[in-house]
Amino acid sequence: MKQSKVFIPTMREVPAEAEALSHRLLLKAGLIKQSTSGIYSYLPLATRVLNNISKIIREEMESIDAVEILMPALQQAELWEESGRWSAYGPELMRLKDRNGREFALGPTHEEVVTSLVRDELKSYKQLPLTLFQIQSKYRDEKRPRFGLLRGREFLMKDAYSFHSDEASLDATYQDMYQAYSRIFKRVGINARPVVADSGAIGGSHTHEFMALSEIGEDTIVYSNESDYAANIEKAEVVYHPSHKHSALAELTKVETPNVKTAQEVAEYLKRPLDEIVKTMIFKIDGEFIMFLVRGHHELNEVKLKSYFGTEHVEMATPDEIVNLVDANPGSLGPIFDKDIKIYADNYLQDLNNFVVGANEDHYHYINVNIGRDFDVTEYGDFRFITQGEMLSDGSGVAQFAEGIEVGQVFKLGTKYSESMNATFLDNQGKAQPLIMGCYGIGVSRTLSAIVEQNNDENGIIWPKSVTPFDIHLITINPKKDDQRTLGDQLYQKLMDSYDVLYDDRKERAGVKFNDSDLIGLPVRVVVGKRAEEGIVEVKQRINGLSEEVQIDELEYYLQELFKNIK
């Protein structure tokens, strides 16, 4: 394809709000253009990359007998009401009404639609298992779209759904999909690590995320250098190892703490270690207000609260609700009161005595607080995030942290949707049973960004061979010279038989062409320049900058050998 005919609006400067490296490079190299916050147009180069990613996904899906379909993006509210997610999903669900006042959503996922699709057709165990997938735009009303394609309001996704008669069949498909995802991310050039994860609003009993390692990643991965343990920090279990070092109980005392609210400020003011300060928080869980306690150097994990109580309805109490409950502001909140509120504490509070809590009075705290004497704990549990250096739950070593971008996730849904939506089949005994389901997603547009995050240098993108928009960037330095233009045109026609070629025939300075070439990042550059009359061109590899002059009658063989070694 001739570059003069392709829409590639490269930029010299990018908007200041483009924080992520991939966002800057995709804008600068002319692959995407923002329409509005969180919504982008994919320009020709990006479209070619997305097509290549999608081709690899389709090949791997077909290899495990997944069948492609295409479902509507516009979903009627009635389906979401059947599953219970219309009210539970929250403000991220993009809702709209038609001219008759009927409610719809722009789909962020398709569990409801696909369950509705198959429930009238899958009637016997003999029709199972079945796996369906699609590649389609999804929608989510993000509160704060950021990082370009990594957190947008419209995004391209591959979502697959499997249906089974028993758990063994689901397990087999889950493993097939897990392995297919591993192959997909390897083929597209991403270093992605599977980690144990939380199922979130989709639900289900078992799930893994595939995380592309990146400094800009919004998720923290907990891993071990001594085993294959890896988990999203939201799911990393904290194993309690008691270290009771209790001193004699001191007298409970209320002390003044003027204008200090955070645990760190309290520790500094009272000259006490941060881990002896106890933070108190109140959450509303399924409509009930419950108090939670963690030590000052730890952070409460809301995902673990949802898992512990088996609900998605967990939200922090508002300041007004806290005042109404215990007559205290959040900054002075503590567990010593005469109200009927359950108190749950993180396991590691069992190691403490003579600690510090809020006194439920502005500018005051209690010191020398002790559980059992001053207040009672309803139950202990693992309610916090693991910290770097703590022992891992598999006993393999200590927790290490890395940042990652979620590019895929696989779920065992079980019967969550089939039971609520009455999707049943007849088993081999003729008895009606709910379909057992799995679902599996890959963020296709997010994968595009993740590839760029991991494959670049100071000059621009370095595309992996498997997804590159073109194989070769053919550049004529000065197309006004007959020998260069003629040789460039001849090579373009010849190379197109074996490769996808982007032919820079523009009437631009050589420096502009080379800068754009580095920025766009095709694997190989072939330059027709001052030695064109001698039948010699320069061949340069993007990944390492190595270049060599090659006779044109040897070029075909040279490129064949070169591409064998390019990843």
From Swiss-Prot:
PROSITE patterns: AA_TRNA_LIGASE_II. Its EC number is 6.1.1.15. Pfam families: HGTP_anticodon, tRNA-synt_2b, tRNA_edit. It catalyses: tRNA(Pro) + L-proline + ATP = L-prolyl-tRNA(Pro) + AMP + diphosphate. One of its GO terms (cellular component) is cytosol. Keywords: Aminoacyl-tRNA synthetase, ATP-binding, Cytoplasm, Ligase, Nucleotide-binding, Protein biosynthesis. Transmembrane segments: none annotated. InterPro entries: aa-tRNA-synt_IIb, aa-tRNA-synth_II, aa-tRNA-synth_II/BPL/LPL, Anticodon-bd, Anticodon-bd_dom_sf, Pro-tRNA-ligase_IIa, Pro-tRNA-synth_IIa_bac-type, Pro-tRNA-Synthase_IIa_type1. One of its GO terms (molecular function) is catalytic activity, acting on a protein. It is found in: Cytoplasm. Consists of three domains: the N-terminal catalytic domain, the editing domain and the C-terminal anticodon-binding domain. PANTHER family: MITOCHONDRIAL RIBOSOME PROTEIN L39/PROLYL-TRNA LIGASE FAMILY MEMBER, PROLINE--TRNA LIGASE. Belongs to the class-II aminoacyl-tRNA synthetase family. ProS type 1 subfamily. Catalyzes the attachment of proline to tRNA(Pro) in a two-step reaction: proline is first activated by ATP to form Pro-AMP and then transferred to the acceptor end of tRNA(Pro). As ProRS can inadvertently accommodate and process non-cognate amino acids such as alanine and cysteine, to avoid such errors it has two additional distinct editing activities against alanine. One activity is designated as 'pretransfer' editing and involves the tRNA(Pro)-independent hydrolysis of activated Ala-AMP. This is Proline--tRNA ligase. It comes from Staphylococcus epidermidis (strain ATCC 35984 / DSM 28319 / BCRC 17069 / CCUG 31568 / BM 3577 / RP62A). The gene is proS.
